Amino acid sequence: YQMMEEAGIEITWESQQKFREEMRVKEGQDFILKRVIKNMRQLIDAGQKKIIMDGLYTWSEYKILLHEFPGQVTVVAIVAPKHLRYQRLQNRPERPMQPREIKERDCSENENMQKGGPIAIAEHFIINDGSLEDLHAKLDELTQATHFCKSPMQC
């Protein structure tokens, strides 16, 4: 959002999709990740040992993360049944979407952004088919099972 705001672009679903796709054509599929890696390196330099990154979208981004952080990347895919995902996207308070827009976004994300690859190779999957509290509980369980955190209070 920051780059769009700096460019004076109104933030809508359509403008976000167009902006991301144009930037990926202009600067490469991994343009966002390059900026994120810089921030991650700053966190590491400041002493941070474990970092959670949200929004791994493309296969190119996945390969870059493996190269930048060899042996340190674990991918967790959080997925929801299609009907529930559509319902949530239509009913969300910020930027709700119509079914047509959701279908277009799904096609765009798979065809133009290679989004299926990172999901397919994930080491862990969380099925997000309940409440937000249920999702948080599943995330807490996973962070403990993978020794990312010793307890939810330490994350």
Predicted regions and their residues:
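ATP-dependent small-molecule kinase phosphotransfer cores
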Residues: 1-52, 56-64, 100
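Short, acidic/turn-prone active-site loops that include or flank metal/cofactor-
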Residues: 1-2, 78-83, 102-105
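Short alpha-helical
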Residues: 2, 59-60, 83-84, 133-134
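Short, well-ordered secondary-structure micro-motifs
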Residues: 7, 63-66, 87-89, 113
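Small-molecule kinase domains that catalyze NTP-dependent phosphoryl transfer to phosphate-bearing small molecules
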Residues: 26, 30-31, 90-145, 149
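Conserved acidic residues
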Residues: 49, 73, 123
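Conserved phosphate-donor/acceptor-positioning beta-strand/loop module used by diverse small-molecule
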Residues: 54-55, 67-96
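A short, charged, Gly/Pro-tolerant segment at domain boundaries
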Residues: 152-155
